[in-house]
């Protein structure tokens, strides 16, 4: 798709990437300087703009290219998995003392995951937005658990106002909890023990702020 219209360019890119509102290119965060200080739809004030959805979009990526890269790396797969598990276990152990303030991830029974990331949920009395911004200020990237409660995003504004086009079953209390209190940090296999230890130290410092 080619266009010389900046607005169409933004909309096209949003549709390509799940309908996200953020226009920061991959690898660059908070280029607008307002990642954590605005309110969208019915989301909480300060919800991470990288995970605000203003359109009903698609996951349109170069999947053939991604598959080719995956095939080229398949021999490294066991090493990647073991390192992710190692990083997860090290971070989990380092943060064990914070379980009065945070809900830390545990594997499901009879499972041995290759961890995508390290999911943290703040308990009552711990401000996720404040904690995440402190962690980010120390050079550690964080991410939301995607949309949380999707119907509170701007993409639902019109349907919410008209009260039609979708239905809700139950209270959605868990999606609301995720939306308000949950975030990721990484366990990328290229991370060293020193980086994992630094991340744990910063998270614990953030809880004291």
Stretches found by the model and what they are:
Residues 4-209:
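PLP-dependent aminotransferase class I/II
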């Amino acid at each position: 798709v080619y266009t010389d219209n900046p607005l169409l360019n933004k909309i096209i890119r949003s549709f390509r990437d799940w309908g996200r509102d953020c226009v920061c290119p991959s690898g660059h965060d908070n280029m607008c300087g307002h990642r954590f200080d605005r309110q969208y739809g019915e989301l909480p004030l300060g919800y991470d703009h990288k995970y605000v959805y203003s359109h009903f979009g698609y996951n349109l990526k170069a999947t053939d290219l991604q598959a080719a890269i995956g095939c080229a790396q398949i021999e490294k797969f066991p090493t990647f998995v073991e390192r992710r598990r190692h990083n997860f276990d090290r971070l989990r152990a380092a943060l064990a003392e914070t379980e009065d303030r945070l809900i830390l991830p545990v594997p499901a029974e009879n499972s041995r995951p290759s961890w995508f990331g390290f999911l943290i949920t703040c308990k009552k009395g711990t401000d996720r937005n404040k904690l995440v911004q402190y962690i980010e200020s120390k050079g550690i990237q964080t991410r939301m658990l995607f949309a949380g409660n999707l119907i509170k995003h701007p993409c639902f504004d019109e349907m919410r106002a008209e009260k039609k086009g979708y239905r809700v079953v139950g209270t959605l209390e868990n999606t609301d909890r995720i939306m308000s209190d949950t975030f990721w940090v990484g366990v990328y296999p290229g991370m060293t023990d020193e980086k994992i230890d630094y991340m744990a130290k910063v998270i614990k410092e953030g809880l004291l702020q």
